[in-house]
Amino acid sequence: MDKRVPHPLFKLATELGPLLIFFAANAKFNLFVATGAFMVAIVAAVIVSYVVMRHVPLMALVTAVIVLVFGGLTLVLHDETFIKIKPTIIYALFAVTLYVGLMLGRSFIAILFDQVFNLTPEGWRFLTIRWARFFLFMAVLNEVIWRTQSTDFWVAFKAFGVIPLTAVFAMTQMPLVKRYQIAEATAEASDSERGDTSPR
């Protein structure tokens, strides 16, 4: 199926939109209403992404499934713990997936992030390790915040702290990407090897 490249602002809107709805609903009502609104917004974002791009990035799809599962548990059991540990589960799952990929001689980072650039096997390996460590850091950070801070603070961090932190980290990886990026002339030949971290 044909994949369309969306405007960066569209991608930002589909990622930030549900979080802003979550924050606004929590501020006006409570965490349980916010959780329900967040679940609806996540599903809407996935549908819109598919309509516009003709596909849904794997990371967004996995996140949506976990949001629905843990959000549903939060509402059914009326226990806010489930929605609060949801980010921890997501970050830990991504980190484990990346590390398992390295053990298998593959880098799943290209699939996870729907990347379009081509890197050498060494570059993919370094990038995978860095992102796996970042995900572990975010998992620990989420645990610390929801266990030590108020619900409102945790919601605000989720809405306004996670994306900036991720964006800053991603930007700090650009020198590595440029250093190990495969030249345009050989990029086409490397398509079949994308994400391969096995030694040559």
UniProtKB/Swiss-Prot annotation:
Q: What membrane topology was assigned to this protein in its record?
A: Multi-pass membrane protein
Q: Where is the signal peptide?
A: none
Keywords from the named record: Cell inner membrane, Cell membrane, Membrane, Transmembrane, Transmembrane helix
Q: Does the keyword section mention Transmembrane helix?
A: yes
Pfam families, per the entry: IspA
According to the lineage, what is the superkingdom? Bacteria
Which GO cellular component terms are attached? plasma membrane
Q: Where in the cell?
A: Cell inner membrane
Transmembrane segments in this chain: where? 32-52, 56-76, 93-113, 126-146, 153-173
UniProt cross-references to InterPro entries, sorted A to Z: YciB (IPR006008)
- What HAMAP family would the database entry show? YciB
Functional summary from the UniProt entry: Plays a role in cell envelope biogenesis, maintenance of cell envelope integrity and membrane homeostasis.
Please report which protein family the annotation says this sequence is part of. Belongs to the YciB family.
Q: What's the protein here called? A: Inner membrane-spanning protein YciB
The source organism is: Afipia carboxidovorans (strain ATCC 49405 / DSM 1227 / KCTC 32145 / OM5)
Gene of this entry: yciB
